[in-house]
Amino acid sequence: MMAFVAIYTVGRLKHSHEHPASREFFEVGNEVIRQAAKTGDLIKEFSPNRVLFPENAIKGEGSPILTLTVWKNLQTLFRFTYSGQHMQALRERNKWFGSHQERQPNYVVWWTEKVTDVSWKEAFKRYDSYIQHGPAPFAFDFKSAFDHSGEKILLK
């Protein structure tokens, strides 16, 4: 059975969209997505335009930056996240993003049989589940990861 992995990320810009730091973030972000597309491992990128965001994603300082993408598998997603330009962007994220609330993860990952089952609504549900119950096969992070059958695995 073919299974894909979805990742939902949540960040909050420190500055307005017009601020040079934010403009730099969008340039870097576009480049990172171009690189992701080139790998052949990125299956789908969802647009955040006209999405009704949940209250917890929008309240607070700074504008929310949310991404939702689907990948071929967990290993390729993990490798992409911690290499190349994306790794560089992670190192510089404090320039662009404010710090996260206690216990609020800035991303959540889950397995899906069908790309068509992935949606923003689904992402918000998985994120809430992670906040309430911690990492589980339903919603997890790279530190506490699960394989497609729900077994704990170590990513490296």
Feature-to-residue mapping (PLM):
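Glycine/Thr-rich phosphate-binding loops that ligate phosphate moieties of nucleotide
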Residues: 67
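Short S/T/G/P-rich N-terminal loop/turn motif that feeds into the first structured element of a domain
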Residues: 1-64, 104-156
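An amphipathic, aromatic/His-enriched active-site/gating alpha helix that lines ligand/cofactor pockets
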Residues: 61, 74-105
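Exposed, tryptophan/tyrosine-rich binding patches on extracellular proteins
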Residues: 71
